[in-house]
């Protein structure tokens, strides 16, 4: 830990540690009524599925507390793309081109959230629904 200027803490105490980013990468529902009150970060961005115990309630509360939330399926997009690429024998270059678009999607979600004053989970759901609707009409 000292090599990276980090501090090891008990997992039960993690929510009360001052940090920039909380990255839940294993267990879902770690953002709940109890932990959200303790959370001391400005960003939640992790690979765990279903990080918010109650998406609407906790997503809205994080917005009120000015905590930026990167939805799980946005963070997981690279892994999903890689699986798809393996099945369809895409080249490394093709996979990287697909993955580079995650940044653009993240920016789009954050901008929509800000413009419409809605939580990022809702902005990402709206964008996903629009894309699925567009694809289904093809």
Describe every region a protein language model picked out.
Residues 1-71:
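Rossmann-like adenosine-cofactor binding region
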């Amino acid at each position: 830990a000292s090599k990276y200027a980090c501090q090891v803490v008990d997992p039960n105490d993690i929510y009360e540690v001052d940090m920039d980013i909380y990255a839940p990468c294993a267990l879902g529902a770690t953002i709940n009524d109890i932990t959200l009150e303790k959370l001391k970060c400005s960003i939640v961005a992790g690979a765990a599925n279903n990080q918010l115990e109650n998406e609407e309630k906790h997503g809205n509360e994080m917005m009120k507390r000015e905590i930026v939330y990167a939805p799980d399926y946005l963070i997981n997009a690279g892994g999903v793309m890689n699986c798809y690429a393996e099945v369809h024998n895409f080249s490394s270059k093709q996979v990287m081109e697909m993955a580079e678009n995650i940044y653009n999607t993240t920016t789009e979600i954050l901008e929509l959230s800000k413009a419409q004053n809605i939580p990022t989970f809702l902005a990402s759901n709206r964008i996903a629904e629009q894309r699925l609707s567009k694809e289904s009409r093809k």
